[in-house]
Amino acid sequence: MEFYESTYFIILIPSVVITVIFLFFWLFMKETLYDEVLAKQKRDLKFPPTKSDKKKTEKKKNKKKEAQNGNIHESDSESTPRDFKLSDALGTDEEQVAPVPLSATEASAGIRERKKKEKKQKAAQDDHVTKESEGSKSSGKKVEPVPVTKQPTPPSEPAAAKKKPGQKKQKNDDQDTKTDSVASPAKKQEPVLLHQEVKQENVSGKKKVSAKKQKVLVDEPLIQPTTYIPLVDNSDAGALEKREVVEVAKQNMNEGIQKSGGKKMKNETDKENAEVKFKDFVMAMKNMIFTEDEARCVVEVLKEKSGAIHDVLQKASKAESAAAIHQLQDKEKLLAAVKEEAAVAKEQCKQLTQELVAEKERNGLLTAKMRERINALEKEHGTFQSKIHVSYQESQQMKIKFQQRCEQMEAEISHLKQENTILRDAVSTSTNQMESKQAAELNKLRQDCARLVNELGEKNSKLQQEELQKKNAEQAVAQLKVQQQEAERRWEEIQVYLRKRTAEHEAAQQDVQNKLVAKDNEIQSLHSKLTDMVVSKQQLEQRMLQLIESEQKRASKEDSMQLRVQELVEQNDALNAQLQKLHSQMAAQTSASVLAEELHKVIAEKDKQLKQMEDSLGNEHANLTSKEEELKVLQNMNLSLKSEIQKLQALTNEQAAAAHELERMQKSIHIKDDKIRTLEEQLREELAQTVNTKEEFKILKDQNKTLQAEVQKLQALLSEPVQPTFEANKDLLEEMERGMRERDDKIKTVEELLEAGLIQMANKEEELKVLRTENSSLRKELQSLQIQLSEQVSFQSLVDELQKVIHEKDGKIKSVEELLQAEILKVANKEKTVQALTQKIEALKEEVGNSQLEMEKQVSITSQVKELQTLLKGKENQVKTMEALLEEKEKEIVQKGERLKGQQDTVAQLTSKVQELEQQNLQQLQQVPAASQVQDLESRLRGEEEQISKLKAVLEEKEREIASQVKQLQTMQSENESFKVQIQELKQENCKQASLAVQSEELLQVVAGKEKEIASLQNELACQRNAFEQQRKKNNDLREKNWKAMEALASTEKLLQDKVNKTAKEKQQHVEAAEVETRELLQKLFPNVSLPANVSHSEWICGFEKMAKEYLRGASGSEDIKVMEQKLKEAEELHILLQLECEKYKSVLAETEGILQRLQRSVEEEESKWKIKVEESQKELKQMRSSVASLEHEVERLKEEIKEVETLKKEREHLESELEKAEIERSTYVSEVRELKDLLTELQKKLDDSYSEAVRQNEELNLLKMKLSETLSKLKVDQNERQKVAGDLPKAQESLASLEREIGKVVGDANVIENSDVRTESELTDKRLNVAVNLNQDVGHLKKLLVSVSQMLSKGREHYQLVE
């Protein structure tokens, strides 16, 4: 049984749970027993003996040895007490070495007191053990107190249990360092106890090993488990001694309980190993170092064992009493120190008791929880077992059904095998008969083929001659093509020449007429040449047509051959399809895997039969191929003859068609002559038109010349400097130019018409040439057709003779083809039977291969599971890499957030700079225009916008990367789903393999875990997307705020520009108004001074000053000066008003700066609020993730349960599908049986044919009978011919012997027929038996007749001798 089987796994889980529960109970029972023991110890406590300072070093050494030998096993502890009991009597030598300063009276009193205490404690513990054994079986083994040290397995030896409290006090000194180990005693004790239980079960199987281990364990000092120190008064000095006694009693009880099961098995081994144990004990006593208390305990044990040792000890005690008194005094000194240590230990014990109470409460809660969990697990276990039981019953039912179907299929297969054997026998007999017939037919075919081969040789020679003629014709065609190319070149040269002539035709009309005459002559010569060329072309075309027709005939013959080949291929395909059907049927018949071993044997026999059949078939195939080749030769001969006939028929048809074509050609010639006449008339008309156009062209040229002269005159007139005539002649010039343009247009149209007419002339000349050539070719064709008509008479006689020969050959070929088809059908039947056998063998081989493949699949499934595990590991690595990438992306996002913050800081700095610049602008409005500063601000803002666009691009790239990662996750999910499907398929295939089911479930769990990880990654991606969207929103808000700030800046800039423009315009207007006023005033003041208004104001003022000074020199007055002072005051007031307006504009700019600062502050406050909200949302997301994870765990648990149910359903469906397959196979077998029956009917038909042949042979025998009767009559009538008959007797005997052989053959065939028809109907068998009986009777009758004839002959001879 494997570990991962379901039944073993179900049993193991509850057993582990039960052991854990018993461990918890054991710990609690231990604590309760410890309290009871403490109460008993308080009653009987006494002061222990003192210790010496010299023995402390020895105790430390013993502690080290005990620490080395702390992990003693329970199986060894069971065997060690016997060793001590056997060797107690012999330990006096070691006892005398250690000094024992005690009197005999003290020793005896101590022994009595201890015996009484041990009896009381044993009685109390026996009662307690009986109670616990009734409550639970395991509590009796777990009565030990909770230890403080790290050694949880106490030894069960009585010698180690009787150690005195001197050693324990020394251990209590180190109790401060070991309080940490008290908190978890139960946890450290559980694995050791489990190990002890496993070892106790295997004690019976490991006796020899335990005996060897005991030798080693005796050499090492045993460790006494330390116990809790009770709360006792300082006056109770003997409490430690009583505690040891209680521990000894407990250990004895535990030993009694543990040894009750194994005493019987160990008595035999202890007797065998007694001597070895004694030696080991002596060696151990020599090596050990005892304290006084330990030595006293050993002596008491030895006293109990033997009385002789008591006398020896009394003598030794008298001698050493003085030394003991000194030691007692030293020990009393040590008691004071020990009491102080005991007080410290009491305080520690109080603390430990409080901790114990807290641990008890904790353990109570844990036990309650464990009980609830165990109850739930038991319920689930029960439901699971019920489900498994139901599924197991269903599977058993399905197996029973499957076995029944298998048995049915085996019975059917056996029946089919019997039928196959019968069919094989019938096939073998039929093949023998067919081979004999085929041999005779082949001889006939060979003779016919020899004749046909001779005829083929003659026709091949004729074909070679025809090919030579064709080659000559092809050479002539090539020459004609060359001539055509040369004619085309000449034609192109003529076209070029005509174009040149048309160009010269425009220059002079008289030369044109002469040239036209010359051209006509040339055209006639060319036309004659072209007609010659056309005639040669037509001849070549006729030859080409003949060649093409011959090639078409050949192509038709090849097509017919291809059609026949295709038909044969189709027949082969049909046969292959039938063979494939038979293959599938035979494979379905032999699908049972149970027959694999039997079929191997059958395959070997059938392989031998197949080899024989294949050899025979190979011979038949060779014969058939030779026959097919001969047939092909005959068919080629036929085709060649038919082609010749077709040629002759074609010639006759061509001759008939040529007569019709002659008539058509004559008609077409008349039509073309009419066309030529019409074209010549059109040419003449067009020539007249060209002459007229040329005359008009000359007239227009003359008019142009006159107009040009007039234009020159007008230009001369224009050159004259008379203005009134210029205006009058303008109209005339315009009219003249219009006329000139109209005439130029007319000239152009006339030229175009002339060119079109020349082109038409050239085209019509070409058409004339073509028509002339066609006429000449038609005339030549007429001549050739007349020649062919004269040759027709000679061809017709040849055609008739050839047709007769062809009809004869066709009859022969048809007979040969029929014979071949019959043979092909026979061979096809044989091939079918052979292929059926090969299919059976292949099916058997396939079944064996399938059985092997199934065995290999079972091995491959384990490898697939391993591969899936490796794939899952790879997927885990991919998931880890994805997580690392996500972490990197998160880091990048954080970095980008920091960059955004930095950019926001830069934006704040820029806004502050903008404010500073605005302030500077307000200060420098009078000096520098505001437009340049606004442009700087716009450039900076544009730079910031570019940075923001870059950030947008970076964010979009990151979003794309995240989208790609999401796609990768989706692909991972799809792969995981595919892995799920593969795992489910593996489950369905491995329903029978319980060992691999556990592994597949583990793989599903791993896949589910990976899906969880993927889901968590998707959630993280969604969170990151949300974070990205939030950051986008933030960025959008910041952009909107920046845009608002930009809009505010733009509005302020526009306002400032408008105001500056307004102020500038107003200033200019004011300045202009002031300048105008000043001029007017100055002119009013000095009316006699006048200056031009186009001069600038400054020049005007300078000039006016000069003029005014000159004027003032002449006339001076004080009143004018006063008026000027008043005007200056008014100008100063205007200047003050302008300054006030500038201050107002500055205040407006300051207000806009304040608005921008407020916007920045609001933006920063909103950013802080958003950050707080983001942190709160992240906390909420973490909480939601934790809750979602818990819900996902529950959902996955439910999914696993659902998957288990689905697996059971799938198993059921799989079994149902197997049943359906079995039913389908059964139906296929039935159909195959029907087909085999059809084959049997066909074979019966063939046998009937053979039976008809036998009847025919019987008729021949009857004819022979008639002949014999005629011979007898002749013998009776013609006695004179007896001498001749006597000479012909040996020949007649030979003929009779041959007849008897033939009759024997017929009888053998009849027997074969009877043997082959084992499975036929009863009527056929009766008929054939009657035929055989009749044949035998006829043969007997013939023999009697022969005997009578011989007797008559002998009598005739005797009579002849007597006559002589």
Curated annotation (Swiss-Prot):
GO terms for cellular component: endoplasmic reticulum membrane. It comes from the Eukaryota. It is a single-pass type II membrane protein. Residues 30-1364 are lumenal. Residues 315-1085, 1116-1306 form a coiled coil. Parallel homodimers formed between the membrane-bound and the cytosolic form, and also between 2 cytosolic forms. This is Kinectin. It comes from Gallus gallus.
